[in-house]
Curated annotation (Swiss-Prot):
It is found in: Plastid, Chloroplast. The lineage of its organism: Eukaryota, Viridiplantae, Streptophyta, Embryophyta, Tracheophyta. Keywords: Chloroplast, Plastid, Ribonucleoprotein, Ribosomal protein. GO terms for molecular function: structural constituent of ribosome. The keyword GTP-binding does not apply. This is Large ribosomal subunit protein bL33c.
Length: 66
């Protein structure tokens, strides 16, 4: 079966400061959120400001590859 060309796609947002800093010593992971975006309205990579429980603050979460 061929891949569907849906307009809305599921994406994963990952904390950019956790990835850049290599995660704090006491934290156990990297913050990730799953959401959807409209491929026609937002063709570029999505970046949203979300709360990171590992950094304990609001940081920019960027779209990553699946």
């Amino acid at each position: 079966m061929a891949k569907s060309k849906d307009v809305r796609v599921t994406i994963i947002l990952e904390c950019t400061s956790c990835v850049r800093n290599g995660v704090n010593k006491e934290s156990t992971g990297i913050s990730r959120y799953i959401t959807q975006k409209n491929r026609h309205n937002t063709p570029s990579r999505l970046e949203l400001k979300k709360f990171c429980p590992y950094c304990y603050k609001h940081t920019i979460h960027g779209e990553i590859k699946k």
